[in-house]
Amino acid sequence: MRRELIFLVGFMGVGKSTVGALLAVRLGWEFIDLDQEIEKTHSQSIREIFEHQGELQFRRMETEALQNLKQRVRCVVALGGGAFADENNRSLIRDMGYSFFLDCPLEIIMNRCPIDLSRPLFKNRPQLQELLALRLPHYQTSDYRIEISNLTPEGIVDRIAEQMADWYSGSSEHLGNERSGA
């Protein structure tokens, strides 16, 4: 049986950290931003890690940070945009808890994430489109999908909390049967 960990999945700019912090407060659970955990553990920003050690090393650090959550319970975890694209990470996440894909159209992401040279994998619009196209099939394997384009962060939290209430009331036999929260 999976433990009580909720993983928020999605592209940069969809609000995983904002929603995660709000959801954790609502539930009385701990909130963990995986990128911040990596930065704290390695005393470097994500940008510095990419610049000095490369993406491959960063992805190893990401997997290690996920493995460090194995004994945790009652946590809401905001994943970095690329964490769920790794098969090993998806397997770890499925073993530890449940994933919610915060789905948002590209145009909204573009408005939320203007070109930002501090983001290691996002330098221009075509690059963003390509990266999203590569990651989307992985995001879509999440346990649940929530279309967030017309929702406030509080509205997203409400949707996740409603789903969790269904789990605890026993109205859902098995989490993962229903993949859409929209």
Residue ranges and their predicted role:
Residues 25-36:
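Post-Walker A helix-loop "phosphate-sensing" segment adjacent to the P-loop in P-loop NTPases
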Residues 34-94, 138:
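ATP-dependent small-molecule kinase phosphotransfer cores
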Residues 8:
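Hydrophobic anchor at the beta1->P-loop junction of P-loop NTPases
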Residues 11:
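P-loop (Walker A) phosphate-binding loop of NTP-binding proteins
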Residues 95-137:
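A glycine- and Lys/Arg-enriched "phosphate-lid" helix/loop adjacent to the NTP-binding pocket
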Residues 14:
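ATP-binding Walker
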Residues 17:
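Walker A/P-loop
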Residues 1-2, 22, 26, 72, ...:
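NTP-dependent small-molecule kinase module
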